[in-house]
């Protein structure tokens, strides 16, 4: 019988969740849903010194906003609770002791000063990587070098100690990664990692392996930065005798800077003017409020689609996928090895596509919510007409107000550069003449307005394209905007006449 798919997203609550972490959560989620498996949220808070208040709730809120819903976790519970590692502390102790008894780990009593002296000694000897390993452990203060009676006495006396993994000397660790294929590592390059700290709390390495075993995790899908830790984790599985139930490893390619060189960081995001966090983060240390993708106006479904394609390819030309379609198409085999450039323009494109696919009724909420705040009167039909006009240019929900407010509020300023280029004496006189015929246009709709304007200009041998920018400046204050005739129809006959007359009164023709 094939092993059930059970995957976990296991972030540490040490600050705001990076967008790369969201992609990791998403890939785990997609694999679980694809195979009717279980997606687990486990909080890895073994490093209490780095714990940041609010970070755990931030992780929960992020997944909730994106619809990446855990089947088991700190809120949902489940058959392998608790799902917070600090609540599992006593259990890790038992497994650490088991390794010591099996000769796979040992007690180490070295003080920070002694550890520093060891590193200095190795550096002086020109050792490339000064570390606590199979060679240096021989002259350190641990249960491999001290008599058993002394070890027992030190422990009974309450002397601080850690439990270290006894790294095999000069062996080859081979394991298969679903993305990278076979990986080989020489153990002489690895150190004797601490498994249990002096405060009795397990380190990430021990807790991670024990929990993955106990929670029956089938696949460990995580970032490439954890690849160097994989050999130790393989050796821990072997030390416990758990090789037969060891999960498959999947190390995801890193997200690169927009330029393509180096790992994406908050500094890079700030430099290019885009967020690095999924939702807003209030830094408890500094009080700084940092906006996330949500606050910038990215739709959760668009962000999911964008992130899914950062490292995974469905094959073919299709780019737009609902979450359900992603589940159906997803496979580990199509995850690439190479780092992926974080292209914010592509993220914007996805957001734009998802907005365009919404109905005018759905989009109108983005506009009417702002109108309601400002107590500006409108009709439902009017709001939907405006959204239909604006949607092709909108990238974010807030664009519907930013581009739609001009339909309700006359411009208070006019584009000086556009005036300098367009507002000649002839244009001024022509506009004044057009204003005079506006009251006669009936019905007052885009087609009639355009026809009347064309006839009016034809009599004066003026091209319509010469006057359109002038009318737009008078009506909206700028030369950019949605279809002009439809805009005039929505703004209405009376308000259009008022705006054009105001502009004629305020704007002085060039050269006058």
Swiss-Prot record:
ATP binds at residue 266. GO terms for molecular function: ATP binding; glutamate-tRNA ligase activity; tRNA binding; zinc ion binding. It is found in: Cytoplasm. The keyword Membrane does not apply. It catalyses: tRNA(Glu) + L-glutamate + ATP = L-glutamyl-tRNA(Glu) + AMP + diphosphate. It is an enzyme of class 6 (ligase). A motif ('HIGH' region) lies at residues 11-21. Keywords: Aminoacyl-tRNA synthetase, ATP-binding, Cytoplasm, Ligase, Nucleotide-binding, Protein biosynthesis. Its main location: cytoplasm. SUPFAM superfamilies: An anticodon-binding domain of class I aminoacyl-tRNA synthetases (SSF48163), Nucleotidylyl transferase (SSF52374). It comes from the Bacteria. One of its GO terms (cellular component) is cytosol. Its EC number is 6.1.1.17. Belongs to the class-I aminoacyl-tRNA synthetase family. Glutamate--tRNA ligase type 1 subfamily. Catalyzes the attachment of glutamate to tRNA(Glu) in a two-step reaction: glutamate is first activated by ATP to form Glu-AMP and then transferred to the acceptor end of tRNA(Glu). This is Glutamate--tRNA ligase. It comes from Amoebophilus asiaticus (strain 5a2). The lineage of its organism: Bacteria, Pseudomonadati, Bacteroidota, Cytophagia, Cytophagales.
């Amino acid at each position: 019988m094939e092993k059930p798919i059970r995957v976990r997203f296991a972030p540490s609550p040490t600050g705001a969740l990076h967008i790369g972490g969201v992609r990791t959560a998403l890939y785990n989620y997609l694999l679980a849903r694809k195979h009717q498996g279980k997606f687990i949220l486990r909080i890895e808070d073994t490093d209490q010194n780095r714990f940041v208040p609010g970070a755990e709730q931030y992780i929960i809120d992020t997944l909730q906003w994106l619809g990446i819903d855990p089947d088991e976790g700190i809120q949902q519970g489940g058959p392998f609770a608790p799902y917070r590692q600090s609540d599992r502390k006593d259990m890790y102790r038992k497994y650490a002791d088991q390794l010591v008894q099996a000769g796979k780990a040992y007690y180490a009593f070295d003080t920070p000063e002694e550890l520093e002296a060891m590193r200095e000694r190795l550096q002086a000897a020109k050792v490339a990587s000064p570390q606590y390993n199979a060679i240096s452990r021989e002259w350190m203060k641990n249960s491999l070098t001290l008599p058993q009676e002394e070890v027992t006495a030190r422990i009974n006396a309450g002397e601080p100690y850690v439990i270290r993994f006894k790294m095999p000397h000069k062996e080859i660790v081979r394991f298969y990664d679903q993305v990278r294929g076979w990986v080989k590592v020489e153990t002489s390059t690895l150190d004797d990692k601490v498994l249990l700290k002096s405060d009795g709390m397990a380190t990430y390495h021990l807790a991670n392996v024990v929990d993955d075993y106990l929670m029956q995790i089938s696949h460990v899908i995580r970032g490439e930065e954890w690849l160097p830790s994989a050999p130790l984790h393989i050796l821990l599985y072997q030390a416990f005798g758990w090789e037969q139930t060891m999960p498959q490893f999947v190390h995801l390619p890193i997200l690169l800077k927009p330029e393509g060189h180096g790992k994406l960081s908050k500094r890079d995001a700030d430099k290019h003017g885009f967020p690095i966090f999924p939702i807003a983060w209030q830094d408890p240390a500094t009080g700084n409020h940092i906006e996330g993708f949500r606050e910038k106006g990215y739709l959760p479904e668009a962000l999911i689609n964008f992130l899914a394609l950062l490292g995974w390819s469905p094959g073919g030309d299709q780019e737009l996928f609902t979450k359900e379609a992603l589940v159906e198409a997803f496979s580990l085999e199509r995850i690439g090895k190479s780092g992926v450039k974080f292209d914010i323009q592509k993220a914007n494109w996805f957001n734009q596509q998802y907005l365009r696919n919404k109905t005018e009724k759905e989009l109108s909420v983005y506009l009417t919510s702002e109108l309601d705040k400002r107590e500006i009167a409108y009709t439902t039909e009017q709001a939907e007409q405006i959204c239909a006009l604006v949607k092709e240019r909108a990238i974010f929900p807030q664009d519907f107000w930013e581009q739609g407010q001009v339909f309700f509020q006359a411009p208070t300023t006019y584009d000086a550069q556009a005036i300098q280029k367009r507002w000649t004496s002839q244009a001024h006189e022509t506009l004044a003449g057009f204003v005079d015929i506006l009251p006669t246009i009936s019905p007052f709709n885009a087609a009639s307005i355009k026809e009347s304007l064309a006839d009016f200009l034809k009599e004066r041998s003026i091209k319509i394209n010469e006057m359109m920018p002038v009318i737009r400046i008078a009506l909206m204050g700028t030369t950019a905007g949605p279809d002009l005739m439809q805009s005039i129809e929505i703004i209405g006959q009376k308000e259009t006449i008022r705006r054009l007359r105001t502009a004629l009164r305020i704007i002085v023709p060039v050269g006058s």
